[in-house]
């Protein structure tokens, strides 16, 4: 994926060195956008191997409205371990906001169900938006949402998605986010009878941690390979009925994994 390598290079060459919450230090730019045509292949990195199992299970976990890491641990996914409390809870993070956004009268809004229904009944609406950023509950979250708002758009029978990500850990997090939202777009397209269009990824604070510089430089020496295809079980017509077994990535060839520490 040339778009991703261009982002890495842009931040390394033009970014500003800054301090950060974790004390690690970053080099960052503010405001960057990438676009991926999903008809041209599934946008997963080929210049380092990604753990696709983690990406799929995390997305299914979000869609379940779950905020405890028990499901993830059961399926060998450890990406949230550092932030969970002793009971495995994370507070009202993504799944809660997506599926149970609290209202002042004590009710809840299922933003995802509302989104799907809106795409079916009023595809031309400009209100197909889901937000995970709830200012009233941010302090109760183990980690406030980095990928905090997304919008869907329908044109010529194709469904496109734009994500706004306030904070992007380019080396470790952003590759996961690209694949996750590309997959979500494909899933929503299938259950609404549309074709997958573009995934547009807009980043606010796009940063490389100081202890990822060497790894980023190594990745820039590698040449992108052709993108694989994501095959989704066509029998699934309900977004909340997808299971891990309904997805198969074919033709995925990637360079070896590059290890890097997580800044907590």
UniProtKB/Swiss-Prot annotation:
MF terms (GO), sorted A to Z: thymidylate synthase activity
GO process terms (BP): dTMP biosynthetic process; dTTP biosynthetic process; methylation
Cross-referenced CDD domains:
TS_Pyrimidine_HMase
- Protein keywords: Cytoplasm, Methyltransferase, Nucleotide biosynthesis, Transferase
Q: Which InterPro entries match?
A: Thymidate_synth/dCMP_Mease, Thymidate_synth/dCMP_Mease_dom, Thymidate_synth/dCMP_Mease_sf, Thymidylate_synthase, Thymidylate_synthase_AS
The EC code for this enzyme is 2.1.1.45
Q: Where found? A: Cytoplasm
Pathway(s) of this molecule: Pyrimidine metabolism; dTTP biosynthesis
Outline what the protein does. Catalyzes the reductive methylation of 2'-deoxyuridine-5'-monophosphate (dUMP) to 2'-deoxythymidine-5'-monophosphate (dTMP) while utilizing 5,10-methylenetetrahydrofolate (mTHF) as the methyl donor and reductant in the reaction, yielding dihydrofolate (DHF) as a by-product. This enzymatic reaction provides an intracellular de novo source of dTMP, an essential precursor for DNA biosynthesis.
Q: What is this protein called?
A: Thymidylate synthase
**Which organism's genome codes for this protein?**
Sinorhizobium medicae (strain WSM419) (Ensifer medicae)
């Amino acid at each position: 994926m040339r778009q991703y390598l261009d982002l890495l290079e842009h931040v390394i060459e033009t970014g500003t060195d800054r301090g950060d919450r974790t004390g690690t230090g970053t080099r960052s730019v503010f405001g960057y956008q990438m676009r991926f045509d999903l008809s041209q292949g599934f946008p997963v990195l080929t210049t380092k191997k990604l753990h696709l199992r983690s990406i799929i299970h995390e997305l299914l976990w979000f869609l379940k409205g779950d905020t405890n890491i028990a499901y993830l641990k059961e399926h060998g996914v450890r990406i949230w371990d550092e932030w969970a409390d002793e009971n495995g809870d994370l507070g009202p993070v993504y799944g809660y906001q997506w599926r149970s956004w609290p209202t002042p009268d004590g009710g809840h809004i299922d933003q995802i169900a509302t989104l799907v229904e809106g795409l079916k009944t009023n595809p031309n609406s400009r209100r197909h938006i889901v937000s995970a950023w709830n200012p009233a509950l941010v302090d109760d979250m183990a980690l406030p949402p980095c990928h905090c708002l997304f919008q869907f758009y329908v044109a010529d029978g194709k469904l496109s998605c734009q994500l706004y990500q306030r904070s992007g850990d380019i080396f470790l997090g952003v590759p996961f986010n690209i694949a996750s939202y590309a997959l979500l777009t494909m899933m929503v397209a299938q259950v609404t009878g549309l074709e997958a269009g573009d995934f547009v990824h807009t980043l606010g604070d796009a940063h490389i941690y100081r202890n990822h510089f060497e790894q980023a430089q190594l990745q820039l020496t590698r040449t992108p390979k052709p993108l694989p295809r994501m095959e989704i079980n066509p029998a699934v017509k309900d977004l909340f009925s997808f299971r891990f077994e309904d997805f198969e990535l074919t033709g995925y060839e990637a360079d070896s994994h590059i290890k890097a520490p997580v800044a907590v």
